[in-house]
Amino acid sequence: MSGSAAAVMAKPAFRKVEWLARDIDVERRADGTVVLKSRIPLQTYEKHLPASLAKWAKEAPGRIWLAQRGGPNREWRKVSYGEAKRTVDALTQALLDLNLNGRPVAILSGNSIEHALMTQAAMQARSPAAPVSPAYSLMSHDHVKLKYLFDLIKPAVVMLQDGPTFEKALKALDLTGVTVVHVVRPCEGVKSVSFAELAQTPVTADVDASIAKITPDTVGKLLFTSGSTGMPKAVINTQEMMCANAAMMMQVRPRTPGGPLATVLDWMPWNHTMGGNAAFHPVLVDGGTLYIDDGRPMPGQLEETIKNLREISPTYYANVPAGYAALAAAMEKDDALCRSFFKNLSIMAYGGARLPDDLYDRMQALAVKTTGERIVFYTGWGSTETAPTSTGTYWDTERVGLIGLPFPGVELKMVPCGSKYELRLRGVNVTPGYFGQPDLTKKMFDEEGFYCIGDAGIFVDDSDPVKGIIFAGRVVEDFKLTTGTFVHVGSLRTDAIAAATPVVHDALVAGQDRAFIGLLAWPNLHACRQLVGNPDLSFEDAVKHPEVIACFKRGLQAHNKECEGASSRIIARAMLMAEPPSIDGNELTDKGYINQRAGLERRAALVERLYADKPDQDVIVLR
C-alpha cells in the first residue's frame, strides 16, 4: 500500500449524516447540452408557511422557536411556538384592520424576534413581507436604492426596530398613506404605532378566514436582488416556492430520527434569501429552534458569536469562509468552545465564496481533536429567484468549491459556453417573475422555461456527472485579453485571494481588452494588523506597509508560479486599495459580494494606473 493511500485510509470517518441517494438522470443532447434531475420525487410539503407555525403551536406549544439576546445584561429572550402563534394572530388582525388589500409590509431593520413575527403576520394577512437591506437606510448617503424600492413596491406598512436609528431614511421617504410601526422608540416627527400595541389587538374570526384563503400561489415575500447589475429587483416568492424549497433542503439532509431537535445559531440577514429563506424556513418547518446571532464574521463583532457558541450547541451551522477563519482561530485557543460547538453538530455549511483548503483542514483538525470524527462541509447553490437553493453537496466529500447536484424537483440545464457550461434552472422553487417589472420577467427564461441564472459550472468528471459540479463564476464577468485568451474571473479571483491570504479580503480582476491581467485588492485589515503587530493600523497605512506589501506580493508570485504558462491565470500587476467597497457606488451587494463590473468602472483611474507604461510606486509589478 502506498503512503498516500494509507494516509487516506487513516482519516477519521465523517459523523453520520443520512444523505439522500444521488440517483441522477442525465440527458445528453446533440448540441452538447446536458440536463440533470433527480429520479427521486420531491417529498410532500405544507401548502403555506403559516401552516407550519400553526402545526408546532398545536403539537409543541412550549417549545422554543426563536431566541435573541437583549436588555442591559444581554440575556436570551425566548419565544415559544405557542406564544408566537398568539402574537402573530394578533398582528394579523391588526394588519387586516388596516385594509392592506395585498399591499406589502416593508421591514427596514435587521433580524429580530419582532421581524420574524411581523413576517408571519403579513403572510397570514396575505400581504407580502418585504425585508429591505438595513444598509440601504443606514449606510447610504442619498437613499437612492431605498427610495427606488419604496416606489416600486408601494408598501402599506413600514416596520423598523428603532425610530431614531432610521430617522434619516424615514424622512427621505414619502410616507403618505403608509402606517409606520416601531418596536423600541418612535421617530420624532414621524407618526407611528408601536409593535406592542398591535400585538395586543383582539383576534376575530377574520384571521382564520384570511389564512384559509392562502394558496400555493399567494405571494409570501418580496425579496430584493443584491443589485449587482443595476437597481435591485423585487423577486416574487410564492408560498409554494418557499415551502417546496424547505422540503428540498430537508429531504437531501434529513435530521437523524431520534437525534437532537434542529438547533440553529445564525446571523445571516433575513433581507437576503440565504438568511431569510434557507436558514429560517427549514427550522420553522421542522419545529426547531433558531437562535438569532447578533454577531458578525468581522473584527469587533465576532465576540458575540463566540459568546453564543459557548452556550448553544447547534445541530447545523452555516457561515461564510471569513467567519469560519475567525471561528477556527478562536477555537484553536479554547477547548471548551470546541466542545460546545461540535457537541451536536452534524453539518457545517458555507457559502458566499470558496472555502480555502487550509481552512477546511484546520476545522477538521479541531473536529477530530474534539470528537474523534470529521464533520462534513456542505454547500448549496441558487439565487434569490430560486428560493434560493437548487443544488447541494448531499454526500460525504472532502472537496470544496462544488455546488453539488440538483435537488428533487429541480432540473439543471447545462448549456455549452466555451470551456464550461452556462447553468439554467427549472422547478417548483423558481419564481414566476419580478414584481412590477414584466419586461424583466420575460428576459429571465429561455425557450423551455429554464431560468437563466447567469452562473457557470463544469463537471468534476465529464464521464461521471454524479461526482458533482464545480462553480465556475459568473458568465457575464468573464472577458478576453487582447491576445484572445479567455479569462474566467470567478475562479481566478478566489484563487488569487486564497494565494494572498491572510492579507487580502477581496479583489477586482482587470484585463478586458488589455494585454495582461491586473488585480486591485482590498486588504483584510484585521489580518494586516496582526501581521505588523499594530492594532490601530488604518487602511491607508496598511496598503503602504512594507510587510503587508511583501506578504501580498509573495502570495501572488506563488500563484503565478503554479500557473506558469497559462496566460489566462497569470497576474502581471497588482495594487492594494485603501477605500472600502461602496454600497452607494454599487460595488458591494447586500450579500457582501463584489460587483466586478461596477467596481472596475468606479475605480477606472486605478485601473489606468495598473496599465500605465511606467507604473507608479504603488503598483506591484509581477511580470
PLM feature spans:
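Conserved structural elements of the adenylate-forming
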Residues: 85-91, 201-207, 216, 235-257
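Conserved AMP-binding/adenylate-forming core of the ANL superfamily
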Residues: 41, 66-120, 137-147, 194-203, ...
